[in-house]
Each structure stands twice: as structure tokens, then as C-alpha cells.
Amino acid sequence: MSELNYEHVFNVLVDKTAEYVTSNNLKAMVLGISGGIDSTVVAAICHEVSNKTDIPLIGRSLPIKNKEDEFSVSELVGEAFCDEFKVFNLSNSYKASLFDLCADAGLIKDCKGYDWYWVSDLEELTGRTPIANGNLQARCRMKHLYDIASIRKGLVMSTDNQTEYQLGFWTIHGDVGDFDPIQDLWKTEVYGLANYLRDRYKSKALEALHNDYKETCDKYRAMSYAVYSSCKLIPTDGLGISNSDLEQIGAKSYDEVDDILSRYIPFKEYRQKHGEPLHPHDEMAVLLGGQIQLFALDGHLARGEIHHHI
């Protein structure tokens, strides 16, 4: 995959996002911030859009059983890029949804109320997989973001990249918002853009320091450090399903995944364009192997979402 001009990419993404929000007369951009690289890059894009349009970026960190390092980085990102940022714990919302599921299925027979149960008890009672429970967490977060957007007359920003889309590595009604600035970028390109932004903010901080603009210097230092901290995190879905995204996919690196997908997709599109029958298992077997093949077949080729239908 060829190296992109990330300065140009960033400017194009900012312009397209600004055009969308202004042409639709939206009053706010609402973004869920996990601390991961995707939401961090989208936050940086929306921050620039906000500077150009005066449309505020409203960020929320919505922890549910999150790891401490993810939570701390989400705060760095939110405080660096958002016009309004808040941490709001949705553990009670998740627990209430589990309780309602159990009650609806007739699994709660002792007339005990919501407060009598631990989350782990309710998860066990449903008999659902960790993936299914992870999807419920994602949907709790998305519902909250859409409620905020409704009140503020805004839209919810998506944070899915092309790699996740092609693999089906997303949750229906849990990940996809109204507008996605990075949907055409592979995961490796998201990292490339993040590295460009980190260096860009660092350079601006040094320039401000040289000119004795301390407040401006501190602002850009915070932005650079937020992006740096996000890049250092091991990518996870934030749902507690596995230790990392790559572990779920069955790959050693995103370079490997993006290389496979970028070779497979033109092959698939050529067959479809020329009206030839598509034999997905045969074609994928040519290009993939092991767990990555199974993951891609179950997600991308099934036209579903890997988290949803398992």
C-alpha cells in the first residue's frame, strides 16, 4: 500500500465533514471517545471542523467495565479536542438492560428487584456469549449518544475504518453513526494520519513556545500527547471480549490484515463486475489462511457484523 500525503488527507476529511454538518444545518457534533486511535483521529478532525464552523464538538467517555488505561486516555483526548467533554458511567444502564432481558425471558422468578443482582449474575443468567454482551454495551453507548444528539440538534459521528467495515468488525446499532470521516481509511492509514497529527501538534507547540505564547503551547502539547497516548494503546473493541482486536481477528498486525483485504477486494469486485459467479470460500482460501479466513468469511462475506451474529 502506497504512502499517503497525510496533510492533504486531513484537510480533505475536515472539509468534507464541515460541508456535511453545515449543509444539513446541524448544531453539534457528538462523539463517543474510547481512547482508541479511531475515535482520537475523528476527534482531531471534528476539532478542526469546530474551529472552522463554530459548531461545537461534544465528547463523551462512556465506561462500562473498561480498562483503566483506556479510560485515562479517553479523558486526555476529550479534554484536548472537545468543546464540551464529560465522563458518564453507563454501567447502571447496561445492568438495567441485562435485567430487562432476564425478566422478559422469564429467568427472574424470585421477585427480587434490580438491586439484588450483580452484573456478572445477570450475564450468567442470560446464557449469552461475551460477544453478545459486548454488543449490548455498544448499543447502550450509542443510544446515549443519540439521545444527546437529539437534545442538541446534532449528529453522532462514526469512528469505523475501512478495515473494520470489510471484516464485519462492528455492531449493528452500536458503532455506526450519522457521518464517518475515516470510513475510507485502512487501519494502517488511520495510524499514519495519527502520527502526522502528533508531529503537527508538536511542531505547533514548539512554534508557540518560541514566540512565548504559553497558553497556545500548552494546548498543542496536550493535543500531541493525547494522540501519542492513543497510539500507544493496544487496540481493543472496548467491550471486554478479548485482550485485543488482533487477537479476535487472528492476525499478527494490521499491516497483515490490510494487505490481505486490499488484495482480496479488487479480486471480488472484478468477478462481480463481469457477471461471473462468486465462490467466496474458494477465493478467500487463495488469499487468507487460518483464523483470519474464518473471521473474514463470517463477517465480510456474510454481509453482517461479526459481533452481532455470533
Regions found by a protein language model. Give the residues of each.
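Conserved G/P- and acidic residue-centered "switch" motifs that form tight phosphate/ATP-binding loops
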Residues: 36
